[in-house]
Amino acid sequence: MPAARYFKWSYDMKKIILMLCLLAVSVTMYGCTSKEIHKDSGLMKITDDNGRQVAFSKKPERIVVLSPSFLELLEVLDGNVVGRAESTIVRTPDFAKNAAVVGFIFNINTEKVVELKPDLIVAYKGMHEKYIQLFEANGIPVVVLNLKTYEDVKHSIKILGELTGQKEKGLKIASELDKKVQNTVKQLPKNTKRVAILHSSAQNVTLEKENSIAGCVAKLLQLHNIVQDIQSVTAPTGEQMSDKAPYNLEFLIEKDPEIIFITSMGDKNDIEVRLQNDVMSSPAWESITAVKNNAVYYLPDELFLLNPGLRYS
């Protein structure tokens, strides 16, 4: 990757990066929910993250997940997964390796899903809405959940805990991880630093907002994300980009972040070219405090592109 020379780690930055990664994992299991769960005469109704009410007459026994990010949550909640989508980033827990593969996270094999006769499909918000009508036409209930922010994840645990009959277990896990997060934050340096989080793909470079995975964790670490200084933060394109804002070098120079984190998606060579062309080739890049102080850090894809699960908890 470009600018490898910026990987000089001070003691405080080692601590911050370590805390960032640990919290990214803890975030997968904690947050807060205002969504509804109702039980009436054996019928359970939930409201998912798209505001849809979904009814169940019994506990689902055959679950298909359209994102591997849900697998480790379902593992600790003893969910029976019969089908799963794959990703090149998120590893598959051992308990789900024998589950049928239903395509990749961005390209679901709908025929395979229907063949499995699931009684619950867990879909990722902003990614799988196009499949809902087809699955419901086949009598399969679909619950859409988000897994980006601290808040999203606790909600997902509560919903999945209810659906798998493991409500108390889910609440206990969330409580334990809450304590870990609080202990982590207590160890951080007290001074707030300005941070910019760049996200690079082969197509473009954007800034990550507080509702992205990295942005949410940076907020927990009490870092000030400069993108929040934009009066009207809008997404470049579409709902899937709602956690990002357009990249602007002039804005970056004006706000002069003390730390820069970089997340990425795609082929590393293509990303290197994009970062060099759009960001690092400008002489003005060298004037930014984070660059001058060797405080530019690449964050691991497996923790900050998709929800990282429970691997370090």
What function would you assign to each model-found segment?
Residues 102, 109-126, 140, 248-265:
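Proline-aspartate-enriched helix->loop->beta-strand connector
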Residues 92-95, 127-159, 163:
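Flexible loop/hinge segments that line or gate small-molecule binding clefts
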Residues 20-28:
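Bacterial N-terminal signal peptides
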Residues 65-116, 120-125, 223-226, 230, ...:
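A short, structured surface patch at a secondary-structure boundary
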Residues 154-155, 162, 171, 182-185, ...:
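Structured C-terminal subdomain patch of bacterial secreted/periplasmic proteins
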Residues 130, 146-159, 193-217, 270:
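Extracytoplasmic ligand-binding site segments that recognize negatively charged/polar headgroups
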Residues 2-12, 16, 30-69, 168-198, ...:
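Bacterial Sec-exported substrate-binding components of ABC uptake systems
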Residues 204-271:
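Flexible, glycine-rich surface segments
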